[in-house]
Design a protein with these regions (language model features):
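Short, conserved DNA-binding cores of transcription-related domains
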Residues: 1-119
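Acidic/histidine-rich catalytic cores and adjacent linkers
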Residues: 2-17, 336-454
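Short acidic (Asp/Glu) and glycine-rich catalytic loops that position anionic groups and cofactors
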Residues: 21, 114-115, 238-240, 303, ...
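RNase H-like nuclease fold core
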Residues: 55, 65, 77-86, 107, ...
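Short, amphipathic alpha-helical "recognition" segments used to contact nucleic acids or chromatin
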Residues: 129-143
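Short, charged amphipathic recognition helices of the HTH superfamily
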Residues: 142-153, 345, 350
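Conserved beta-strand -> loop -> alpha-helix junction used to position metal-binding or nucleic-acid-contacting
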Residues: 276-283, 288-333
Length: 454
C-alpha cells in the first residue's frame, strides 16, 4: 500500500490525498469481492442444474429435466448437457464497473448447440445489475430527478448514463400501478376521503417539426390533468391508506362517476362496510356520489373548505384594516359553530352566529348557511373518530406530498411516467404510515419486478 505518511500532523491536502487513495482501494477491493461472489454463484448454479460436479460423468440413462433448454432442439435433460467453457462480459453495479466476468456456458450433446442459461444472478444481456434498478426506484420515490440519478450513476460507473436508461427502469413500476387499480379490495375502509390534484402531462399533437439533426418530430404539448385520489380510514385499526387514484381530464361528474364505479366494483360498498364519503364542495363529485351510492352512505362536506369560503366572502364584505378585527371575530365565531356535541346544537350555534352577523356580513352568513347540514352529517356516524371525518385535511397532506413530486418533475412525458411516479409516492407514504423502511419497500418492489419480468 503506497501511502506517504509523515511523523508530523498531515496537512489538509495530504489528508485529502490519503482518504482519496483509501476510497479507491476500498472500491477496487469491493469490486473484486463482488466479482468473486458472482462467479462462485454462477458456478454453483451450473453444478446444481447439472446435478454433478466438474469432471463427474453424465448419467445418460436417466432423465433430469431442468428449466434451461437447448436453443436449437429444445432439450431440457441436464444429463444431455456438458460444460463448454466460458464467455467474458462486464457488469455495471452500484459499486462500479465489474470487469471480466467469466460466465459458464453449456452445450447440448444431442445437437451440439448452446444451451440457453437463465442465471438467477443476472440475465445474459443485462447491462445494469439489480442494485442499480433498486436505486432508481428508491431515489425516484424520494423525489430525486432523472438528472440527479444519472449524475450519481455516471460518477460511480465512470461514464455517461442516459436519462432514458433510468426512466425506463422507473417506468417498469407502472405495471404494478395498473394491477393495483384492478385488484379486489377485501378490507373495506369505514370512511373514504376524495379530492383532486392537478398535474401536467405531455402529449403529441399533429404538428410535425424538425430538430437540430433534421429529424421529424411530433410537437409535444403539456396538458393539465387531474389526479382523483381516494384515501381510506379504518377506525378499528386507526390506519389510513390510499386505496385508489385515477388520472382524469377534469373534476366533472362523469370523471368522478367513472372513478367511483371502479371503487364500487372493487368492493367499496355500504354492504361491505363503507359508512361515509368526505369531500369538498368543488367539481361534480357530489352528483357522482348521488349516482353511484345514492343515500346509502353519509356524504360529509369538508368543514375547512366551508370556513375558507366564509373567509373569502368576509374579506370582500369587511374590507380594509379597519375591519380586520371584525373579520377575525367573525371567523372565530364561525369556527365555534362546529364546537357542538350534536347536530341540533350545531344548528342552534349557527342560528346565533347568523343573527349576530347577518346585518354586517350577509354574504358570509349565506355562505355558511348554504348546505350547512352537509357539513354536520358526521354526527350520524357511530364508532368513528370524528376528527377524521370533519375535513379532508389528511388527504390534503397526501396531496402535498404528491405536489412535491409534481413540482420536481414539472411535467411528465407520458401517462405511464405519471402513473409510475404516483405509485411510488403512494407506496412511500404507506411505508411511512406503517413505520416501514422505504429502502426495504423499494427493494422488494424491484425484486417483484424482476420476478414478473424474468
Amino acid at each position: 500500500m503506497s501511502i506517504s505518511f509523515s511523523q508530523g500532523k498531515l496537512s489538509s491536502e495530504q489528508r485529502r490525498g490519503v482518504l482519496h487513495f483509501v476510497q479507491q482501494q476500498v472500491k477496487l477491493a469491493a469490486l473484486e469481492a463482488i466479482r468473486t461472489v458472482i462467479l462462485d454463484c454462477l458456478e454453483a448454479e451450473v453444478t446444481t442444474k447439472l446435478g454433478r460436479e466438474k469432471g463427474a460423468p453424465r448419467k445418460v440413462g436417466q432423465v433430469r429435466e431442468i428449466d434451461w433448454s437447448c436453443g436449437n432442439c429444445g432439450c431440457k435433460d441436464a444429463n444431455q448437457f456438458t460444460r463448454d467453457g466460458h464467455y467474458h462480459r462486464d457488469l455495471e453495479t452500484g459499486w462500479g464497473h465489474v470487469r471480466d466476468l467469466r460466465v459458464p456456458m453449456l452445450e447440448c450433446q444431442i445437437c451440439h448447440h448452446d444451451v440457453i442459461c437463465h442465471f438467477a444472478v443476472f440475465e445474459k444481456n443485462q447491462r445494469f445489475w439489480l442494485d442499480l434498478d433498486q436505486d432508481a426506484i428508491f431515489s425516484s420515490g424520494l423525489c430525486q430527478s432523472l438528472r440527479e440519478i444519472t449524475e450519481r450513476w455516471g460518477e460511480v460507473l465512470g461514464g455517461n448514463v442516459g436519462l432514458r436508461t433510468v426512466n425506463e427502469r422507473i417506468n417498469q413500476i407502472e405495471v404494478r400501478a395498473q394491477e393495483s387499480h384492478k385488484q379486489t379490495i377485501k378490507d373495506i375502509p369505514d370512511v373514504i376521503q376524495l379530492d383532486g390534484i392537478y398535474v401536467t402531462i405531455q402529449g403529441q399533437n399533429g404538428t410535425v417539426k424538425h430538430d437540430k439533426c433534421n429529424r421529424a418530430r411530433h410537437e409535444r404539448k403539456g396538458e393539465k390533468m387531474v389526479v382523483l385520489v381516494a384515501l381510506g380510514f379504518w377506525q378499528d385499526e386507526e390506519r389510513r391508506e390510499v386505496i385508489d387514484w385515477q388520472i382524469a381530464k377534469s373534476e366533472d361528474h362523469e370523471e368522478w362517476e367513472t372513478f367511483l364505479n371502479r371503487l364500487y366494483d372493487r368492493g367499496v360498498t355500504p354492504e361491505n362496510g363503507l359508512q361515509a364519503v368526505i369531500r369538498d364542495g368543488s367539481g361534480g363529485l357530489g352528483e357522482a356520489i348521488d349516482v353511484v351510492y345514492g343515500h346509502s352512505v353519509i356524504d360529509q362536506r369538508c368543514i375547512f373548505h366551508k370556513l375558507k369560503n366564509v373567509a373569502d366572502a368576509s374579506s370582500k364584505e369587511l374590507k380594509g384594516d379597519k375591519h380586520k378585527e371584525e373579520r377575525k371575530q367573525l371567523m372565530q365565531q364561525a369556527g365555534a359553530v362546529y364546537h357542538a356535541e350534536s347536530a341540533e346544537q350545531a344548528r342552534e350555534n349557527l342560528k346565533t352566529w347568523s343573527d349576530n352577523w347577518r346585518e354586517k356580513a350577509p354574504k358570509s352568513v349565506a355562505t355558511l348557511e348554504r348546505d350547512f347540514d352537509a357539513t354536520i352529517a358526521y354526527f350520524q356516524l357511530e364508532g368513528v373518530n370524528r376528527q377524521w371525518v370533519r375535513t379532508t385535511s389528511l388527504l390534503e397532506r397526501v396531496n402535498r406530498q404528491l405536489r412535491r413530486k409534481f413540482r420536481q418533475a414539472l411535467s411528465f412525458g407520458s401517462h405511464v411516467g405519471a402513473e409510475a411516479a404516483l405509485y411510488l409516492q403512494i407506496q412511500r407514504l404507506h411505508a411511512k404510515w406503517t413505520d416501514t423502511s422505504w429502502c426495504s419497500v423499494s427493494r422488494n418492489l424491484s425484486f417483484d419486478l424482476a420476478k414478473a419480468n424474468p
